[in-house]
Amino acid sequence: GGQIGAQATSQWYLDLWAYAFNTGDTEDFMKVCQVEGYCDEFAHDLERMHTDAYLVKPLTNQYLQTKDIYECSLKKDGTEGICIKFTYLQTPAGFRYLTEEKASEQYDTISTVTGEEINNEQRFFRVLFLEERGDTWVVTHIWDH
């Protein structure tokens, strides 16, 4: 519970996201991802991508630093939770597509890189909103910066 539990969940979320991306196995990820309109779509996109292509170089996420952690609430409905601002480093995955047609497929929640970009690490800044559900934390909103 508390902020320590929420922070651990945010790091776990990032690890599960990478695992799901690399393997197509979203079962554990879906237990902590409860973002309406994103989590189910992400799982569907990954299922399609892993059907259309095969992984040749796994994506990596490295949690760098928690910038801030504080109690917060959603203005829309007053839901209370904990907000976590953090940075992480990502190295993109490499996929080979089964056909040229499949290589041009578009996905709503994931993007792929080609050629030289595959070795470019990128630093990201995210804010997660976590809600306590029973004795566990779940991510219900994500803001990219």
Question: What is each of the regions a protein language model found here?
Answer:
Residues 1-61:
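Core segments of small alpha/beta cavity-forming domains
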Residues 14, 20, 30, 55, ...:
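Compositionally biased, intrinsically disordered low-complexity regions enriched in proline and serine
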Residues 33-36, 46, 63, 68, ...:
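A mature extracytoplasmic/lumenal domain signature
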Residues 40-45, 60-64, 107-109, 117-119:
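A short linear-motif detector with a strong N-terminal bias
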Residues 51-77:
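A contiguous pocket-lining binding segment that forms or flanks enzyme active sites
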Residues 71-145:
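Exposed beta-sheet edge and beta->alpha loop/turn motif
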